[in-house]
Amino acid sequence: VVLKEEKHLLIRIPNLKPILLLAFPLLIFPLLTMLSFNVASTPLTWLDKTFVENAFYDVALRHEYAQGNKPLAKWKRPIKIWIDHRVGDEELHQELTELHVQHLAKVTQHPIKIVTRESDANVKWVYTRQSQWIAEAKTVLKLKSTQHLNSAICTAGYRTNSKGEIVYAGIVIPVDQARARGKLVACIVEEITQVLGLPNDSDKAYPSIFNDYTPEDLLSPLDVVLLKLLYEPELKVGMTETKAKPIVRKILKRYSETGVLQQASTEAQQAPLYQLIGY
């Protein structure tokens, strides 16, 4: 497979070792784009219910490099992240991570926290260096092949159980490589966001971190709506698009009537990372 730097790659890796006594596919999402957010110059697509609906199906229920649809996947258990700092600037990386995680927890209303012991975690997040990251990605994500990482900047993956519930995720960011290409923040934001259950890149989602042509590196208002939608209790893990459609439409109608769509821009710009970075 020939990779282009400006595109993402989604690969399903078969025959993985079992987790919780079961073997499930691991989805790998190399982050290959840099993303900054400017509402004034952006189409207000998140206000259009039909646009949001189509974007949701494409981001949550599709695989970029696989045929057909996939069932809905998300976390049901609390997300517990253990961060392994193997390079300098630990304080900076920790702060960037914690600020974005706080925002994700607020947007999704799903419990997400940083833990201090690896044994307590179901997400392993490694900050490393370029010379080590291929080997560490292979270990953290249990990869049999790492060829697809040669043109990637950073990577993440998750596993689901037979019901579609995400039970494990790994993230590996080679800091020197990401910084050299101006994509450290983009790696942090996109990788953890995608392993919440929105794995696919899509031209139908704009502005969005899931769209290669969006110049933003933080969550857009559309991303906020997509995350909220995914973690609505009415949408169950394992749902197909056919089963999800009437529920998605009902929720989006409610969002429009109660101001959720209209408030998405404000909620996106209230992210702690916006305050830190100075957007």
Regions found by a protein language model. Name each.
Residues H93-V189, Q194-A205:
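Metzincin-family zinc-dependent endopeptidase catalytic domain
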Residues V1-L16:
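N-terminal secretory signal peptides that target proteins for export/translocation
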Residues K80-D84, I171-I173:
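Short, aliphatic-rich beta-strand segments
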Residues R12-P14, L20, F29:
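Residues marking helix boundaries in flexible regions
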Residues F37-K80, V87-D89, T108, I153-N161, ...:
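Disordered inhibitory propeptide/activation segment of secreted metzincin zinc metalloprotease zymogens
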Residues A23-M34:
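Bacterial N-terminal signal peptides
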Residues H148-K183, P199-Y279:
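Metalloprotease/metallohydrolase-associated module, dominated by Zn2+-dependent proteases
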Residues H85-V87, Q177:
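Residue-level signal for short, function-critical loop segments
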